[in-house]
Swiss-Prot record:
The keyword Repeat does not apply. It comes from Methanopyrus kandleri (strain AV19 / DSM 6324 / JCM 9639 / NBRC 100938). Keywords: Cytoplasm, Endonuclease, Hydrolase, Manganese, Metal-binding, Nuclease. This is Ribonuclease HII. It is found in: Cytoplasm. PROSITE patterns: RNASE_H_2. It holds the Pfam family RNase_HII. The lineage of its organism: Archaea, Methanobacteriati, Methanobacteriota, Methanomada group, Methanopyri. It is an enzyme of class 3 (hydrolase). NCBIfam families: ribonuclease HII.
Length: 210
């Protein structure tokens, strides 16, 4: 195939739920849909744009769901790179555009991603605000992660945003650790928040025992 593939992720930082890495393959960088960084859009605006993206015959949308146990096993950076690599190899675009991760040089990033020869790589800070094809990927990733978290809440009850800064999420983690709930598998055990709360719960159980 050919074209430009914008790639972005949602859910890199939360202690709960998956990370979703999305790719949008388009004939060119700009789509003319008015897409911009998903973090700047309301939920209703994201829904409107996701419908437009999914129904646009010029575009091919793909995604990879990275579950918490994968992140715990591989680390978030490696898991993200593997997801990006998978999306690129399925689409084989002429060009890939994504947010520049950390202090990676273009040469090191290309090595880490193991991109096939001939694919042009553009990695820039705030690429999701500069290139509409990356904005579109950002919208897809954010929308799908929100849907997954919502489905989990429908089954297990409120979890909150999933971020370590959300008291609802931390409180739910604490309750699940106390009772060994099934929902625990959707929390990232390698996160400092998980380790801290787990330590608190164990300490409290010891105090209650004595």
């Amino acid at each position: 195939m050919s074209g430009v593939m914008g790639i972005d992720e949602a859910g890199r930082g939360p202690v709960f739920g998956p990370m979703v890495v999305a790719g949008v393959l388009a004939p060119k960088r700009e789509l003319g849909l008015g897409a911009r960084d998903s973090k700047e859009l309301t939920r209703s605006a994201r829904r409107r744009l996701i419908r437009a993206l999914m129904s646009d015959e010029r575009l091919r949308v793909d995604l990879r769901i990275v579950w918490p146990w994968e992140i715990d096993e591989e680390g978030v950076a490696k898991a993200e790179f593997e997801a990006i690599r998978e999306l690129v190899r399925r689409a084989m675009p002429d060009e890939v555009i994504l947010d520049k991760p950390g202090n990676y040089s273009p040469e090191r990033l290309r090595r880490e991603l193991d991109l096939p020869e001939g694919i042009n790589l553009i990695a820039e800070e705030r690429a999701d605000a500069k290139y509409e094809v990356v904005s579109a990927a950002s919208i897809v990733a954010k929308t799908y992660r929100d849907w997954i978290v919502r489905l989990l809440e429908l089954e297990y009850g409120e979890v909150g945003s999933g971020y370590p800064s959300d008291p609802r999420t931390v409180d739910r983690l604490r309750r699940e650790l106390r009772r060994g709930g099934e929902l625990l598998k959707y929390f990232r055990r390698s996160w400092e928040t998980y380790k801290r709360v787990e330590s608190e719960v164990k300490q409290r159980k010891l105090e209650d025992f004595f």
